[in-house]
C-alpha cells in the first residue's frame, strides 16, 4: 500500500472519530440544555438556578434569578414549540474563563409571543457535566 493511501485512510478515520466525538458532546450538551429549559418551562426557576453552572450561580443569587426570570417568562405564557436553530462550540467567550462551551439558539414560540429566540450557553462545569452558564431570550 502506498504511503499516500495510508495517510489518506488515516486522515479519513481521524475525521470520522472527531466527528463522532463532536456529535457525542453536542448531544450531551443539548440534552442538558433541554432538561434545564424544561425546568424554566414549568416555572421551576429556583431549581433551574440550582442545576446551573457554578459560574452562573456566582454571578446571580437565587432570589435575583427567580425574580428576573419570573419577570421575563411569566408574561410569555406557556411554551408552544422550541426548535434548535444552531449550536456553536467555543473555548473562549467574552467575560468568561476559558473552557468548553456550546452556545445554543432556539426558535421558540410561546402562548403570548409567537416568535422568540432563546440563547442558552452551556459549559463543562467543575464536575465535568454540561450545565447552563447563561440564558437570554429575545
Residue ranges and their predicted role:
Residues 21-23, 34-37, 52-58, 107-109:
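Second-shell loop/turn segments in exported
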Residues 16-23, 67-74, 117-119:
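Short charge-dense sequence patches
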Residues 87-138:
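Exposed beta-sheet edge and beta->alpha loop/turn motif
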Residues 30-31, 46-99:
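Short solvent-exposed beta->alpha transition segments
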Residues 2-4, 11, 16-44:
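Short, low-complexity N-terminal intrinsically disordered segments enriched in polar/charged residues
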Amino acid at each position: 500500500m502506498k504511503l499516500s493511501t495510508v495517510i489518506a485512510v488515516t486522515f479519513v478515520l481521524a475525521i470520522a472519530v472527531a466527528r463522532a466525538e463532536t456529535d457525542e458532546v453536542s448531544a450531551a450538551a443539548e440534552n442538558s440544555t433541554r432538561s434545564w429549559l424544561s425546568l424554566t418551562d414549568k416555572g421551576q426557576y429556583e431549581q433551574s438556578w440550582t442545576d446551573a453552572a457554578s459560574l452562573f450561580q456566582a454571578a446571580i443569587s437565587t432570589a435575583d434569578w427567580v425574580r428576573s426570570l419570573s419577570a421575563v417568562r411569566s408574561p410569555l405564557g406557556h411554551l408552544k414549540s422550541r426548535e434548535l436553530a444552531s449550536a456553536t462550540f467555543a473555548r473562549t467567550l467574552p467575560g468568561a474563563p476559558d473552557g468548553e462551551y456550546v452556545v445554543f439558539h432556539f426558535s421558540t414560540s410561546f402562548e403570548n409571543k409567537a416568535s422568540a429566540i432563546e440563547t442558552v450557553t452551556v459549559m463543562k462545569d467543575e464536575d465535568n457535566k454540561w450545565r447552563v452558564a447563561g440564558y437570554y431570550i429575545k
